[in-house]
Amino acid sequence: MIFTARRRGSSPKFQVFNTALITALSDMTQAESLADREFWGRLTESAVGAHLINASAGGTCEVFYWWERNREVDFVLRKGKKLVAIEVKSGRTTTSLPGMESFSKSFKPGRMLIVGPGGISLERFLSTPVEYWINGAER
């Protein structure tokens, strides 16, 4: 799914509902998974996506991703008129987030969250109900 001001065709983003299948098929140990930055990044983003999709299945919100040209936002939550942009980072802290900046200029989300180093810890994000992040309980 894609969230834009105008409708246009795009390839859907593949999202698993449970990361167990990915890890089982990878045939990697936890240490190997952590050492492989690309794999760990996909796994981390998939875990966040599964958490958000499960919330959307319960009616909490709608979940999208946003991509325009070479800029993207990993996840966009919409509940009524509220928008929340979420960028997932699994490596080092990032100071430049051009996708978030571009999305913010175009859509003025109520919140922009970074999950991972320099933002909300992955453990905290996954153990907190999605409603908490939508309703702006923490700024």
Please place each PLM-identified region on the residue numbering.
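Nucleic-acid nuclease catalytic cores
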Residues: 68, 107-126
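Active-site-adjacent loop/helix micro-motif of nuclease/hydrolase catalytic cores
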Residues: 92-100
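Switch/connector loops and helix/strand junctions flanking conserved nucleotide-binding motifs
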Residues: 24, 95, 121-125
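Hydrophobic/aromatic beta-strand patches that form the interior of the parallel beta-sheet core
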Residues: 15, 84-86, 113-115
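Arginine/glycine-rich "motif VI" loop of SF2 helicases in the C-terminal RecA-like domain
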Residues: 55-58, 102-110
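Accessory nucleic acid-recognition modules appended to NTPase machines
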Residues: 1-73, 77-80
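Domain-level recognition of nuclease-like catalytic cores that cleave nucleotide substrates
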Residues: 119-139
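Active-site ExK catalytic segment of metal-dependent nucleases
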Residues: 81-92
